[in-house]
From Swiss-Prot:
SUPFAM superfamilies xref list: Dehydroquinate synthase-like (SSF56796)
Gene name in the database record: aroB
Enzymatic reactions: 7-phospho-2-dehydro-3-deoxy-D-arabino-heptonate = 3-dehydroquinate + phosphate
Annotated source species: Pseudomonas aeruginosa (strain LESB58)
Protein name: 3-dehydroquinate synthase
Cofactor note: Binds 1 divalent metal cation per subunit. Can use either Co(2+) or Zn(2+).
Length: 368
């Protein structure tokens, strides 16, 4: 078992990473302040792991709240089901919420914790690779709006993150690849040696070799913790964690939430960010292609939806949290391992990026 820390003064918290942590009270008891707990999960994860988690919560009065599964349910109506259950069972301010599931459950349970009686404690128990390496760490919580992804929410930190790597054994391969999009992101934005490590270990990651998976999660969480510790509320460097996300969120919104998995959209969006960085003269063609190959090896789409036009992208990208004073800002790369957030780019470069034939670029890479 490995422990990392997110350093935020009085709101600091541990990240526990290991196998078979879910049923062990040691990782939960120190972070539960009262007698009552509400476990927020979904119809896919609860049958797999709720019973195991309940073993760690013996001695507490537990209310399970099982929600529909999927990005399409990351909305106000589903959030209301959490509040309904908490109020019906008379949960008070000493209640601890536990998010048992992927990113959707973590985001909604965290937002519910931020809102319920103006704030109660919560613990993240992420069960997908994407949520383990990204969304469970850093305190971003919220729901989607029909006009934009994650536009309603709050910064609200958990008391702990408990990452049981054994939960990945039941993860579908498509979800595993989606999580690898966020793992690869850390190499692209701040850790070029990690890119080389991922190239060398991608087959082992896809095969879920335990030591390799644990190292990938630890390195990803350590990078996320450093960035969040330096910029909790995304006023500066934390925005670099959104590499590929502005393009990716446009894909998710246009296609309908849940049609493309978040990580899949980030994968294609990252290829677009690589291409734009190349067009600006910040990345060589070889670096662009290296990044694209790694994403493709992870099983991610490297071509955005063929039916999406440049105008479609611009319509959705205008509703983005990084837009300031009406100006679109993007996360781009000035070399692999060096991300920047900028709105200082020629509009024609962005337009050319949106109109690029990504299928032709992918075909030029050839087979692995």
């Amino acid at each position: 078992m490995r422990t990392l820390h997110v350093d935020l003064g009085e709101r600091s918290y541990p990240i526990y990473i290991g196998e078979n942590l879910l049923g062990d009270a040691r990782w939960f008891a120190p972070h539960i302040v009262g007698r009552r707990v509400a476990v927020i999960s979904n119809e896919t994860v609860a049958p797999l792991y709720l019973e195991t988690l309940l073993k760690a919560l013996q001695g507490h009065e537990v209310t399970p709240v099982v929600l529909p599964d999927g990005e399409a349910y990351k909305q106000w109506e589903t959030l209301q089901l959490i509040f309904d259950a908490l109020l019906k069972e008379r949960h008070d301010r000493k209640t601890t919420l536990i998010a048992l599931g992927g990113g959707v459950i973590g985001d909604m349970a965290g937002f519910a914790a931020a809102c319920y009686q103006r704030g109660v404690n919560f613990i993240q128990v992420p069960t997908t690779l994407l949520s383990q390496v990204d969304s469970s760490v850093g305190g971003k919580t919220g729901i989607n709006h029909p006009l934009g992804k994650n536009m309603i929410g709050a910064f609200y930190q958990p008391q702990a993150v408990v990452i049981d790597t054994a939960s990945l054994k039941t993860l579908p391969s498509r979800e595993l690849s989606a999580g690898l999009a966020e793992v690869i992101k850390y190499g692209f934005i701040c850790d070029e040696p990690f890119i080389t490590w991922l190239e060398e270990h991608m087959d082992a990651l896809l095969a879920l070799e335990p030591t390799v998976v644990t190292e990938a999660i630890e390195r990803s969480c350590a990078a996320k913790a450093r960035v969040v510790g330096a910029d909790e509320r995304e006023l500066g460097v934390r925005a670099t964690l959104n590499l590929g996300h502005t393009f990716g969120h446009a894909i998710e919104t246009q296609q309908g939430y849940g049609v493309w998995l978040h990580g899949e959209a980030v994968g294609a969006g990252t290829v677009m960010a690589l291409e734009m960085s190349h067009r600006l003269g910040w990345l060589s063609a070889a670096e662009r292609d290296r990044g694209t190959r790694l994403l493709r090896r992870a099983g991610l789409p490297v071509v955005p939806p063929a039916e999406m036009t440049a105008e479609d992208f611009m319509e959705h990208m205008a509703v983005d949290k990084k837009v300031l004073d009406g100006r679109l800002r993007l996360v781009l790369l000035q070399g692999l391992g060096n991300a920047v957030v900028t709105g200082d780019f020629p509009r024609e470069i962005l337009d050319a990026t949106l109109r690029t034939d990504y299928r032709a670029l992918a075909d030029q890479l050839g087979d692995e």
